[in-house]
């Protein structure tokens, strides 16, 4: 820019306001212009057409009585075809924009709860932009974009919100852990039930094999040794099994056993009890 030999340079993205004897005459676009100062022509000022940004911090209160600082970022620029309005009608453009932002935010936020303010910040930005567009277009300015860039509650409120969020996440984690333990216990119980079922099948087959072996032994012994009865053979088998059991208990150093009468007479008593039980069961079936 300059004024040399009645010539004026206007830079790119800038316009100059030309006056003659203090009266607006024309808007000078970028380039070199002739202004005969001796005829009263002069440049009253320059107006930038670049996009400018204004950050406005507004303190207000929400519907649930929480004080928050809302930071709005306003991007605006002067219109080349309304440069004279932008230059002459407003003396403090930034102050005017700030006043409208305060008005809209303090009218919108008190209607919302704190959580809703965060969720509806785009709606608040849109309301601010619409109000600014209506007001500033009459002064030769265009609102390019309006953003709500930050919402800052009081520090104590932020701490409380973080604690609530942390408690909710801990509760969710506890529920998930309890559910996992429940599933683990169910699976463990199902496994134990299946194991016991298979163990029962094995025991049943083992006992069936023992019964079959005893029956074959009794029959074979009775055939090979004349004069013996089934009772004599059974007593002998029980005594043999008794000594086998005592041998197994004595062979193990860490065995757990329930001590019962262990004399041969006691074995005969046990055999009598078993036979009596079997005979009573057979009589009941008949």
UniProtKB/Swiss-Prot annotation:
The keyword Coiled coil applies. One of its GO terms (molecular function) is protein histidine kinase binding. It is found in: Cell membrane. It comes from the Eukaryota. It is a lipid-anchor. A lipid is attached at residue 2 (N-myristoyl glycine). One of its GO terms (cellular component) is plasma membrane. The keyword Acyltransferase does not apply. SMART domains: PHB (SM00244). Keywords: Cell membrane, Coiled coil, Lipoprotein, Membrane, Myristate. Residues 114-190 form a coiled coil. Self-interacts and forms heteromers. Interacts with NB-LRR class of R proteins before R proteins (e.g. RPS2 or RPM1) are activated by the effectors. Interacts with LRR1. PANTHER family: HYPERSENSITIVE-INDUCED RESPONSE PROTEIN 1, STOMATIN-LIKE PROTEIN 2, MITOCHONDRIAL. Positive regulator of hypersensitive response (HR)-like cell death. May be involved in potassium ion channel regulation. This is Hypersensitive-induced response protein 1. It comes from Arabidopsis thaliana (Mouse-ear cress). The lineage of its organism: Eukaryota, Viridiplantae, Streptophyta, Embryophyta, Tracheophyta.
């Amino acid at each position: 820019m300059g004024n040399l030999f009645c010539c004026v340079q206007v830079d790119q993205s800038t316009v100059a306001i030309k006056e003659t004897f203090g009266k607006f005459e024309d808007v000078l676009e970028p380039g070199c212009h002739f202004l005969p100062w001796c005829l009263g022509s002069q440049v009253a000022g320059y107006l930038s057409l670049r996009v400018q940004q204004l950050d406005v911090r507004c303190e207000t209160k929400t519907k649930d009585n929480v004080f928050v600082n809302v930071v709005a970022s306003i991007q605006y620029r002067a219109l080349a075809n309304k440069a004279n309005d932008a230059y002459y009608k407003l003396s403090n453009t930034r102050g005017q924009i700030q006043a409208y932002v305060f008005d809209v935010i303090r009218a919108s936020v008190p209607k919302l709860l704190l959580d809703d303010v965060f969720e509806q910040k785009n709606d608040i930005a849109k309301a601010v932009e619409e109000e600014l567009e209506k007001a500033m277009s009459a002064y030769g300015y265009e609102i390019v974009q309006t953003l709500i860039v930050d919402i800052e509650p009081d520090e104590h409120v932020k701490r409380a919100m973080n604690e609530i969020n942390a408690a909710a996440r801990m509760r969710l984690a506890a529920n998930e852990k309890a559910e996992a333990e429940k599933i683990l216990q169910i699976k463990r119980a199902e496994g134990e039930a299946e194991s016991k079922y298979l163990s029962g099948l094995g025991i049943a087959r083992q006992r069936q094999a023992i019964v079959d072996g005893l029956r074959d032994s009794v029959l074979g012994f009775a055939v090979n040794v004349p004069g013996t009865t089934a009772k004599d053979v059974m007593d002998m088998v029980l005594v043999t099994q008794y000594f086998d059991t005592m041998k197994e208990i004595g062979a193990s150093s860490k065995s757990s056993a329930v001590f019962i009468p262990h004399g041969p007479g006691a074995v005969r008593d046990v055999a009598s009890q078993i036979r009596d039980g079997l005979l009573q069961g057979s009589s009941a079936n008949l």
